[in-house]
């Protein structure tokens, strides 16, 4: 009897578990572009085009390996519009004995798949996604009984499990974490050679035209599409990072420059998250570069920590916290997302630059997301669910399992410390130190109260003041609260009044 193997748009790996044991002569691989997935939020146009093009290329890759592939395009006349609808059509046409799929990355899709057996009356085999180092059960076991779920300790477990940068039971270099060496501020000499771009082929051009036709009002631009959409090109992007950028990645990973939004960042998250690259293979390539003298330890350790530390940890938190995690709102923030998050039109140069680049590229690196757009949303008291939705929509590497805990837990501290140890709140001083955005901004990061004062300054102190009862016991905020206490009552009043006046303009 034949089986139907469903592969999702973020599972584009030839080693995905659902392909185990496939009989190429009688089993059918199903890939489908469905409106339910393309429109549950208003995804960036480039995000939709990237995923659809990568899916179509993967289908061709599978056909080249001898698999039978059933592919449904978004604009096919008989497209049912959902995974359930497309699986039903395939079952009606092919009468398989069972359905096989690798577990999806999101609660929403998992709920849909859990209904397949009842809906179709045949066996459904949902397999664990072995692209990740830690299964849901393994993460639950690690988390059980711990007072706090500190990522650093989880990361060490992943180092031991993989053997990456290990000498027996000890970390290479005698330390687990070299983050203290990875905080160099922005300098003009950090400008790097451009990352590789990949010209759209015939398939990608067709996808771009389709996305522009079907999603004309979605966020973002389709011009200058340069994503890798094949495994071969994704591997070229990896090689370029290892050869040209990894050596300087560590020290400069927190820096921001107006003329080079990417600096030494890998730009590989798109390909890892959709399956074109394997996360462990990427880490091993970085480790080889260290052992061969091509990159220093602080750079390689920092890069590997992003993948087997933060990435794995965020997935674990997402499934541990459950589907209600999205409703977390520790600070009870309820302000709407400002219009300039969609347009980039604001006098705050850092916000304007990052959002404009997001519109154009469907990308910003992690410090831009955390300490510019995320920091502002936190300080301004934006509804965290609205912030989450924005990040999910605008970035091509954003899938809920990784984006949601990053936003709710890390960026907005909306879970009250379930994930992180303190809010990532900062004034204009941090932005000025780590970037050159302030050099051409109408606002002065060194001013707190004048007409040209950077809004981040008053907003920062107002955030601490209005949330004092919830944060005063956090020892990591003892210093800023001590500074606030030393200010005169008049200065404190004026800072809060300035913040209130600015926030009124947002409403």
From Swiss-Prot:
* Root EC class: lyase
Binding-site residues for 6,7-dimethyl-8-(1-D-ribityl)lumazine, renumbered to this chain:
9-10, 32-40, 105
Question: Disrupted gene: resulting phenotype?
Answer: Cells lacking this gene show a strongly attenuated photoreactivation after treatment with UV-B irradiation.
- Known EC number(s)? 4.1.99.13
Judging by the UniProt lineage, the source's domain of life is: Bacteria
Where FAD binds, per the record, is at: 265-269, 273, 363-366, 397, 406
Give the UniProt keywords, A-Z: 4Fe-4S, Chromophore, DNA damage, DNA repair, DNA-binding, FAD, Flavoprotein, Iron, Iron-sulfur, Lyase, Metal-binding, Nucleotide-binding
The Gene Ontology biological process terms listed for this entry are:
photoreactive repair
Pfam families hit by this protein:
DPRP
Q: How is the cofactor bound?
A: Binds 1 FAD per subunit. Binds 6,7-dimethyl-8-ribityllumazine (DMRL) as antenna chromophore.
Q: Which cofactor does it need?
A: FAD; 6,7-dimethyl-8-(1-D-ribityl)lumazine; [4Fe-4S] cluster
Q: Which reaction does it catalyse?
A: (6-4) photoproduct (in DNA) = 2 pyrimidine residues (in DNA)
Any one Gene Ontology molecular-function term assigned to this protein's record: metal ion binding
Query: Which protein family is it in?
Result: Belongs to the iron-sulfur bacterial cryptochrome/photolyase (FeS-BCP) family.
- The protein in question is named (6-4) photolyase
- Its gene is phrB
């Amino acid at each position: 009897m034949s089986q139907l193997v469903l592969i999702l748009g973020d599972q584009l790996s030839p080693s995905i578990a659902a392909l185990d044991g496939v009989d190429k002569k009688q089993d059918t691989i199903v890939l489908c572009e469905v409106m339910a997935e393309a429109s549950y939020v208003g995804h960036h146009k480039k995000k939709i085009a990237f995923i659809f093009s990568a899916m179509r290329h993967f289908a061709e890759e599978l056909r080249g390996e001898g698999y039978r592939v059933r592919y449904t395009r978004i604009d096919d006349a008989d497209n049912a519009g959902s995974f359930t609808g497309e699986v039903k059509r395939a079952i009606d046409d092919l009468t398989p004995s069972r359905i096989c799929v690798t577990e999806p990355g999101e609660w929403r899709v998992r709920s849909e798949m859990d209904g397949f057996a009842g809906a179709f009356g045949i066996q459904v085999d949902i397999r664990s996604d072995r692209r990740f180092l830690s299964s849901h059960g393994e993460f639950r076991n690690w988390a059980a009984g711990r007072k706090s779920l500190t990522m650093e300790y989880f990361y060490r477990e992943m180092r031991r499990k993989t053997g990456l940068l290990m000498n027996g039971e000890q970390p290479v270099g005698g330390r687990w974490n070299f983050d203290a060496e990875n905080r160099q501020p922005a300098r003009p000499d950090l400008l790097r050679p451009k990352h590789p771009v990949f010209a759209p082929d015939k398939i990608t051009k067709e996808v771009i035209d389709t996305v522009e036709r079907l999603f004309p009002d979605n966020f973002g631009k389709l011009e200058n599409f340069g994503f890798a959409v094949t495994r071969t090109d994704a591997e070229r992007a990896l090689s370029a990072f290892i050869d040209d950028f990894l050596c300087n990645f560590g020290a400069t990973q927190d820096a921001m420059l107006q003329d080079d939004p990417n600096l030494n960042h890998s730009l590989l998250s798109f390909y890892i998250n959709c399956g074109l690259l394997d996360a462990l293979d990427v880490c091993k390539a970085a480790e080889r570069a260290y052992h061969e003298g091509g990159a220093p330890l602080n750079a390689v350790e920092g890069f590997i920590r992003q993948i087997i530390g933060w990435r794995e940890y965020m997935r674990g938190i997402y499934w541990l916290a459950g589907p209600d995690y999205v409703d977390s709102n520790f600070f009870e923030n309820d302000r709407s997302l400002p219009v300039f998050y969609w347009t980039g039109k604001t006098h705050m140069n850092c916000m304007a630059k990052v959002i404009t680049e997001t519109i154009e590229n469907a990308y910003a690196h992690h410090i831009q997301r955390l300490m510019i757009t995320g920091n502002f949303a936190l300080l301004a008291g934006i509804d965290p669910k609205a912030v989450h939705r924005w990040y999910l929509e605008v970035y091509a590497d954003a899938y809920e399992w990784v984006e949601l805990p990053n936003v709710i837990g890390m960026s907005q501290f909306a879970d009250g410390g379930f994930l992180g140890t303190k809010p990532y709140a900062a004034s204009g001083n941090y932005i000025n130190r780590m970037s050159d955005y302030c050099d051409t901004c109408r606002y002065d990061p060194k001013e707190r109260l004048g007409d040209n004062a950077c809004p981040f300054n008053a907003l920062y102190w107002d955030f601490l003041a209005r949330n004092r009862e919830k944060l005063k016991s956090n020892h990591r905020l003892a210093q800023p609260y001590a500074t606030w206490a030393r200010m005169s009552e008049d200065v404190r009043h004026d800072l809060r009044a300035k913040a209130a006046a600015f926030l009124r303009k947002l409403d």
